[in-house]
Amino acid sequence: GAQHAYRKGKSTETALHEVISAVEKSLQVNEYSLIAFLDIEGAFNNVIPGAITEALTDLGVDRHLMMLIDQLLTCRTVTSSMGSSTQSRYVNRGTPQGGVLSPLLWNKAVNKILCDLEGGGGCKVVAYEDDVAIIFSGKFPQTLCDLMTAKLARLSEWTESRGLGINPSKTELVLFTTKYKIPSLNPPILNGCRLSFSDSASYLGLVIDKKLSWNLSIKDRVKKATIALYTCKKAIGLKWGMNPRIVQWIYLAIVRPILLYGVAVWWPALSKGTITKQLGKVQRTAALCISGALSTTPTDALNAILCLQSLDLAGKEQAEIAAIPLRDSDQWVSHHTGHASILNGNKIVPTKTDYCVPREYTDTPFETIIPHRNIWLEGPPGPKGAIRIFTDGSKLDNKVGGGIYSEQLNIRQSFRLPDHCSVFQAEVIAIKEALSCLQEIAPAATHINIYSDSQAAIKSLNAITTSSATVANCRKSLHEMAYQFVISLIWVPGHQDIEDNCIADELARAGTTIPLLHDKEDIRMPMATCKLKIKEHFKRLINDRWQTVSLCRITRQTWPNIIRKRTDELCKLSRSRCSSVIRSLTGHWLIGTHASRLGAPYNDFCRSCRDEDEEETVEHLFCSCPALSRRRLQYLGAPFLINISDMSTISPRRIAGFIRASGWDNG
């Protein structure tokens, strides 16, 4: 359907993808796209209950349930108190704010008109809540305007009959084209008002301009992210305020997501230098806030030390990760150009992953038991007299296998899975294989206990929702077998010398050494593994880019590789100590020649050894100053360092301790 709000597998990203795909497709073939971006006023507050009950009737909802919903909507009382005065009144319009049914009821009420608008005439409709985009594409713009007028009239008629409205002044009309000369046109009419064309429109948080250059949207993103960052900056000083770790979290969790919102549809713009420069300014400001570094510190050095991706790479990584679940849920239409080409030719991403549209389960016809470890001292828990089956999964040398064992049913089975599978998948599939064995053997017993040492597998099978196809398939088998048996999934503690579980573990290990059978080849890579591979790929790109930087001479020696663990240790330091370490690692420090360039006070010679021939430099401090040899031995592990590059193996905490002990920390 056209509605993308409050639906499994749909989101603002799917809505934006459909809108931008339609525009890109028409621009590629040198056609026009006319889009009316409008808002249905009073969607949740003013819709009449009759519109909702009419929609429910068309859907064949039970009459008694429909009457109950109608009563809930028409017999509500609102009470307001001020001082000693209290007023109450009945509310018989709209849906309750915060009501769990309200979004669903609105979707049902508006669904019919959205389908009617899409019917015939080449019209495409994309809606998210009450924000609607009506799209026409073709070669003749005036024809598109006339068709749009008819659709707007139909929508206006529907809204008025339901107690709603559309404000022409808030409706944005954009004619998307790459042509410079556009013929004179009569714009569409809405509610007796002739609309005017706009160069851009705001839709679902993005500013979409008529040529899809994304310049206006990037400016808007930068403005919002800057406001958020400077709001936090008030609590950050050079030697006081939030510590670097918290400021780093604020940037990564709040500011950067604002910058990269909707990047799945505008990532091609990241190839433009002007756009990456605008985005980079925000990240540089954040890096200075995190580190307390001097403003002269190169951006590349700050990004490397703080493990911050340049935003062109961060945006493409996020776009790839966002596109995969949309593709696997059939919400993504790939194309050889434009934003929908993000996954084309990508050898890292498989053609399909284990992701599926989230599925909900209203009933669980089997039992799950996670007993305390001590319970096992008394013997296997669960219903007595039941058939016991032990399952396990294993991963050895990047090979994945599973095992099933039951002494009562004489089952000793091993199986192999594709190497991209996870141990979690092996544990779940082992349970499913146990159910298959039950179906083949058809034992006379009615109670079945299936034991697994994976709490994650048992809890996922007991969850009310799942987005894993592996879990969904196993859950389906459990539901089917529950008609024949009383099934209990029971956790068994691993590595406790429980004999049957040890045998299942041995079978799982053996499964990693046997050939992969044809029926297991189609088991797909888990989404988490796919994300990890993408992240590792972009980490390599970041490191490769850092290795090719021609500037940052000192930083490339003191921090030759981008290592997250070292960055985390640095950010755990206090603000003042973190600032001192970064200034020393980059050479952008208020000492010697650098201080002279900035017009800051400095010493003509080394303050420690008092040698008039030795200038204060980072190399002299860390490598050769004889007056600091004992402190260097104490903190850095050697009285003298051969080269400044030896600093790359020393932890930031020890570097901070040495700087403080040397007395140079006022630079």
Which residue stretches match the model-derived regions?
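A short acidic-Thr-Gly-centered motif at the start of a beta-strand
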Residues: 17-34, 115-119, 373-385, 606-613
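Conserved pre-catalytic core of RNA-dependent polymerases
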Residues: 1-100, 104, 108, 136-137
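Short, conserved micro-motifs composed of acidic
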Residues: 83-84, 150-153, 164-199
